[in-house]
């Protein structure tokens, strides 16, 4: 096989991949890899294979090809290749829950120059996800902030979408469900502009899975089940084992909570789904997935022991201890904390005072290490649905406490680090609304000529003869995509509206009660019940600006942006906007090897 034919096989693999013939595409790339002599072509093909195996949930295979990329980059002594190889290594280790190595390789990628200005943004994103896996929430927010700065500078909407999903996952963990739903809604708004069928399905599947988790925690079980079912179907179509197993776990969680009010058989189905999901996670060596499933199984066993034949406190204790063991191996402190809290309750039921005290001390220590408490009221957050606020220094507080504190201070500083109290534009829900066009316009960023950091960009230029019927979304399918995205956004809007009405009812119920604080003087009910900005008020702030008279928020750090728009558009909640009939069927930003 000549070099020209080998390169044609490589390009044919790209066509097959976008047609969702994943196995055939991988086979083509492997064939061409055995024949190619050019180092750059081999590096690009290795990137394709790493990307494809990551999308399939085969993370050990992805790691193998990333290591081959690193060896090739070292042999060539090419800094741009090293930057990309380090990034793929960081992604592989993050997926394998080896977060320490993910952080090391992510930082190594940032230390090398890249041919594509977007590559550092994906390195920051991977670092943020690694910090999130280790429950280092402050460092996680800092890395998300850095990634969003790159996304704004390069107009990379797919990077912005993944940051939205990451922030949605973060605030779901911290139990600020309103913010989590807002970020996931923005991700859905961005994904509408992605009309490459397989890429659209890939990200929509990811968003719907996280959406099902947030909706379940909010109590919208019907909407959560609908989102989870759709995500599971897309995961099967895409061949993504990792997302499919997580969907099974999420669906089991939903059935578990439905079973509390419906039937014993529902919980039995839930337990069977946990076992199926756990087997898939073990087979894929997905440690983070194992921890998620074990944590859900332990919670189910701890709360619903009477529904299982022969199950007692001892079995629930064993599941929690097994979950702690694996979570400690990967450094996931947040899951360990939840297990210790459950163990304390179980030991209390068994009247084992010593073990109960040990579990509570461990939970208290982890709470301090993760700083899961508000400096103003002294109370933990992350236990119930509460509105939180992050400052530019990435410290997090109860939004109500922070707002009251800053109103009473002339020197507006963070109480933890004493830095100036500046709301983070990228994670604040109080930012100005960007234009709808800015959110829905596709990225126009391309890699510089000759760049190898994002190989699929150059591949797209070479494959300009791809037929729309074969690889791009047809008009009928495009309309279906838009209708599906609009349906998803409507689902989130309904949930946010219900959440807002619940918050309003709670605020009215305590309108005559003062809110004391150990560090801040007590405020009156009119100040304590200050309206908290939710998704609904964010998306309609221009229609209610005269109705709500709020005190001014803390100052923001001035920053530049195009067309005088805010530096981030993730806080914008645009209405659905169909694409023009004569417009392009594909976004100009082609999926790259960094779009994992």
UniProtKB/Swiss-Prot annotation:
GO terms for molecular function: acetylcholine receptor binding; protein-membrane adaptor activity; zinc ion binding. Residues 535-563 are annotated as: Disordered. Residues 535-549 have a biased composition (Low complexity). SMART domains: PHD, RING, TPR. A zinc finger (RING-type) spans 374-418. One of its GO terms (biological process) is synaptic transmission, cholinergic. GO terms for cellular component: cytoplasm; neuromuscular junction; plasma membrane. Belongs to the RAPsyn family. This is 43 kDa receptor-associated protein of the synapse homolog. It comes from Caenorhabditis elegans.
């Amino acid at each position: 096989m000549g070099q020209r034919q080998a390169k044609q096989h490589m390009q044919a693999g790209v066509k097959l991949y976008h047609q969702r013939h994943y196995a055939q595409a991988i086979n083509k790339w492997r064939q061409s890899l055995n024949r190619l002599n050019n180092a750059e072509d081999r590096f690009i093909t290795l990137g394709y294979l790493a990307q494809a195996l990551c999308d399939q949930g085969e993370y050990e295979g992805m790691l193998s090809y990333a290591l081959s990329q690193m060896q090739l980059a070292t042999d060539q002594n090419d800094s741009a290749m090293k930057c990309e190889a380090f990034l793929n290594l960081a992604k592989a280790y993050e997926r394998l829950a080896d977060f320490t190595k993910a952080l090391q390789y992510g930082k190594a990628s940032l230390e090398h120059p890249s041919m594509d200005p977007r590559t550092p943004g994906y390195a920051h994103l991977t670092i943020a996800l690694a910090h999130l896996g280790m429950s280092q929430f402050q460092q996680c927010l800092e890395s998300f902030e850095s990634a969003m700065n790159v996304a704004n500078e390069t107009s990379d909407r797919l990077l912005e979408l993944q940051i939205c999903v990451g922030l949605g996952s973060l605030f779901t963990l911290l139990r600020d469900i309103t913010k989590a739903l807002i970020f996931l809604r923005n991700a859905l708004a961005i994904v509408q502009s992605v009309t490459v069928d397989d890429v659209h399905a890939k990200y929509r599947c990811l968003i719907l899975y996280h959406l099902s988790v947030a909706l379940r925690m909010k109590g919208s079980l019907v909407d959560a089940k609908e989102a989870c079912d759709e995500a599971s179907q897309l995961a099967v179509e895409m061949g993504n084992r990792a997302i499919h197993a997580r969907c099974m776990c999420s669906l089991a969680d939903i059935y578990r909570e439905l079973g509390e009010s419906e039937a014993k058989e529902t919980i039995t189905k839930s337990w069977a789904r946990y076992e199926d999901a756990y087997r898939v996670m073990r087979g894929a060596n997905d440690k983070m997935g194992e921890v998620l499933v074990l944590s859900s199984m332990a919670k189910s066993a701890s709360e619903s022991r009477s529904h299982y034949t022969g199950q007692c406190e001892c079995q629930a204790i064993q599941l929690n201890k097994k979950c702690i063991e694996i979570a400690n191996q990967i450094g996931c402190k947040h899951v360990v904390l939840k297990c210790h809290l459950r163990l304390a309750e179980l030991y209390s039921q068994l009247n084992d005072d010593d073990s109960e005290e040990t579990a509570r001390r461990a939970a208290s220590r982890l709470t301090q290490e993760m700083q899961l408490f508000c400096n103003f009221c002294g109370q933990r957050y992350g236990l119930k649905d509460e509105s939180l606020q992050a400052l530019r220094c990435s410290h997090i507080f109860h939004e109500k406490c922070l707002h009251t504190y800053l109103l009473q201070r002339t020197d507006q500083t963070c109480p933890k680090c004493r830095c100036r109290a500046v709301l983070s534009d990228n994670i604040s829900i109080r930012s100005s609304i960007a234009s709808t066009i800015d959110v829905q316009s596709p990225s126009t960023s391309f890699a510089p000529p000759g760049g190898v950091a994002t190989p699929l960009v150059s591949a797209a230029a070479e494959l300009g003869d791809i037929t729309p019927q074969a690889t791009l979304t047809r008009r009928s399918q495009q309309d279906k995509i838009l209708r599906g995205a609009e349906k998803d956004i409507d689902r989130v809007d309904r949930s946010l509206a219900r959440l807002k009405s619940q918050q309003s009812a709670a605020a009215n119920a305590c309108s005559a009660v003062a809110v004391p604080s150990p560090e801040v003087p007590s405020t009156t009910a009119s100040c304590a019940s200050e309206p908290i900005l939710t998704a609904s008020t964010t998306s309609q702030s221009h229609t209610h600006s005269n109705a709500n008279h709020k005190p001014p928020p803390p100052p923001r750090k001035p920053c530049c942006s195009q067309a005088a728009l805010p530096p981030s558009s993730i806080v914008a909640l645009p209405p659905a906007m169909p694409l023009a009939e004569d417009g392009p069927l594909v976004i100009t930003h082609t999926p790259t090897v960094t779009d994992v």
